[in-house]
């Protein structure tokens, strides 16, 4: 863990690399040119872009590919516990030493990249050396000038739910949902397979508008359904009906992402039987995840449950609320959030959900909101709220012999901190 923190600190404190976000493909393309275009060695690239659901959709596709006895590299962001998690090489994660060596090579090129661009180059350099069938690449914010938009002929581009996240990255005069959709959809390849996940009708209309002249094969989410019979969910399309047997995927939103991945897997010629056998094994760390063991779980009283969810946008919040409504136990929340989100809109979704809410900062994250800032927002929205200096203090304020569910939410960075402590 300390090696991971040191690598992040090395990047954050590096004079050449910028911590601020600055969208521009010129820098990364120059670096890739100097490295003799390793990105061109990546065959069967599948991009995952959008606002909510990139990781769960990518991870599900990866699980299906591996169950089919094929290999895929994967690039994700953010990592939860360790920088290594960003770089899956088909059979293992990159070692800390390999990441360090890659940074040294990039340094020598003397191109002033952003930290996310450096991480993307590290992935491309190392993925280009792997003998695998697919390369699964999660985009950062937006897509038009995102550092992952450097592959000329991707096999597929997967669009997950698009919402108001990333408005803060747009110019003030273009700070609209329509512009978010344009930045993500208007720059997709004309020579690929585009998969569009479940969207609000208003967002779907915008997507259809920007894809009207796109020559790619476009697969919309009306080609499949998530259906429920009794307490059981199923994936259904014109040819297939697949039972979604899972004990750990709790929300409708995550099940829709799983269905989206099933459609992609079927189109990759992965057999229905393999998909059915794989579904029970799929879990999403930090997404609707209960802690059943570990150091934090041991601190709790016998009748206390604790769950984590990295929800940090309005759509995520609604998804989490729909799940929490079905829980009859009293619910207590521990909330943290990054500065570039919409905390007021986010927390409004949880009205009357928690008996008490505790706000906390995120450890080692300068861009996190303070517990006082979040406390004031929650107070304004009439929550029963207290603030704490850290997660451990928040847990002490809540933990008691009362039966309850403790929900930790608001940021994947907070979830990563908690998982590391556990």
Each language-model region and where it sits:
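Active-site-proximal loop/hinge segments that shape catalytic or ion-binding/gating pockets
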Residues: 411
């Amino acid at each position: 863990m300390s090696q991971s923190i040191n690598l992040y600190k090395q990047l954050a404190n590096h004079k050449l690399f910028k911590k601020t976000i600055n969208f521009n493909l010129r820098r990364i393309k120059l670096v890739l040119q100097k490295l003799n275009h390793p990105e061109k060695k990546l065959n069967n690239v599948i991009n995952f872009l959008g606002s909510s659901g990139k990781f769960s959709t990518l991870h599900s596709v990866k699980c299906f590919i591996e169950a089919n006895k094929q290999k895929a590299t994967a690039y994700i962001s953010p990592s939860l516990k360790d920088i290594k998690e960003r770089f899956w090489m088909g059979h293992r994660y990159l070692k800390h030493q390999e990441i360090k060596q890659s940074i040294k090579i990039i340094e020598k090129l003397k191109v002033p990249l952003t930290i996310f661009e450096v991480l993307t180059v590290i992935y491309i350099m190392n993925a280009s050396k792997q003998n695998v069938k697919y390369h699964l690449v999660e985009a950062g914010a937006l897509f038009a000038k995102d550092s992952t938009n450097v592959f000329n002929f991707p096999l597929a581009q997967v669009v997950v739910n698009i919402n108001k996240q990333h408005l803060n990255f747009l110019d003030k005069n273009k700070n609209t949902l329509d512009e978010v959709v344009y930045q993500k959809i208007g720059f997709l390849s004309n020579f690929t397979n585009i998969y569009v996940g479940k969207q609000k009708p208003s967002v779907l209309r915008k997507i259809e508008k920007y894809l009207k002249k796109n020559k790619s094969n476009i697969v919309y989410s009306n080609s499949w359904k998530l259906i429920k019979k009794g307490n059981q969910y199923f994936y259904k399309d014109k040819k297939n009906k697949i039972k979604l047997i899972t004990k750990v995927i709790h929300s409708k939103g995550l099940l829709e992402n799983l269905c989206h991945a099933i459609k992609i897997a079927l189109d990759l010629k992965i057999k229905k039987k393999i998909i059915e056998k794989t579904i029970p094994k799929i879990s999403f760390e930090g997404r609707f995840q209960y802690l059943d063991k570990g150091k934090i779980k041991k601190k709790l009283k016998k009748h206390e449950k604790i769950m984590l969810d990295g929800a940090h946008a309005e759509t995520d919040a609604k998804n989490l609320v729909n799940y929490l409504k079905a829980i009859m136990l009293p619910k207590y929340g521990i909330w943290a959030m990054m500065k570039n989100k919409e905390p007021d809109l986010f927390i409004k979704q949880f009205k009357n959900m928690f008996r008490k809410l505790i706000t906390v900062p995120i450890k080692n994250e300068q861009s996190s909101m303070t517990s006082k800032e979040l406390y004031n927002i929650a107070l304004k929205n009439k929550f029963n709220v207290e603030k704490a200096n850290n997660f451990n203090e928040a847990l002490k304020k809540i933990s008691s012999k009362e039966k309850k569910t403790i929900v930790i939410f608001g940021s994947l960075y907070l979830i990563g901190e908690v998982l590391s402590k556990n």
